[in-house]
Amino acid sequence: NLFISNLDSIPIPDWSLLPELKKFYRPAGDSIKRSPSAGIVTSRGCDGKCYFCNPWQLGKMIRYHSAEYIYRMIVDLMRNHGIRDIYIQDDTFVINRDNVMQFCKILIEEKLDITWACHGRANHIDIDLLRAMKMAGCWQIAIGIESGSQKILDSINKGTTVEQNYKALKLCEEVGLDVKGLFMIGCFGESHETIKETIDFIKKVHITDFHMNFFTPLPLTSAIKLWPKYGHFDSSKGSFMGSTPSFIPFDLTEEELIYYHKYVYR
């Protein structure tokens, strides 16, 4: 009862309350097609049960703004703040396929001069959806691939397969969408062999941008309860963003994890 079920009942954000929106409140540069850009959130919750995340913080039921509400938010940002590019920051924007298709339809019909990027899961992506997104101004989709090893995907309860990831990336390439591939290293059960599987995967697929973080058991996640079965964890190390290793799987050393992380970025 603490959560708002109808997100459209919330007024559109009053961005004028923020000082110099265009200057200080913009997404990271790798998610921007053109400036000025702004980020928005169109839903709350996630249907994933990944061990490294805590989607229940925003409620177990996923709630969405309607396509019409999202459109009004974007129009307000364009007309009143000069925004030309939008970064949709939901964990996975494409879960509600019908809503995304309606959103794309509105943008196409209204001929908005806007570019946008979003996040998605491989198992929610299909060719018709991607084509509609592309026509509506989408230029990039960030996909949480995490690993090229099925063993690792299962160990973190990702709920996707290596084959689904291959297929989703191939469809994005076919449609002409840029892909930001999001990966983790040092997950439960990680080994030299599974890291090599991920490296081989990366070499084969269509990815135009790339991020790899160190797996980190965060508070209030399943990972924080499960890590003793899989390795060593020092909560004083690492960071919320996973930029340095804090969890070390039994089959690897901290130095080896850092080496592989640097190797992948070369």
Question: What are these language model-derived features?
Answer:
Residues 6, 49, 95-97, 150, ...:
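Short catalytic/ligand-binding loop motif for oxyanion handling, primarily in non-cytosolic enzymes
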Residues 3, 22, 193-266:
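C-terminal accessory regions of radical SAM enzymes
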Residues 41-43, 185-187, 247-252:
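Short, well-ordered beta-strand elements within core beta-sheets of diverse protein domains
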Residues 15-182, 200:
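Radical SAM [4Fe-4S] cluster-binding motif and immediate context
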Residues 1-7, 182:
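Short intrinsically disordered, low-complexity coil segments enriched in acidic
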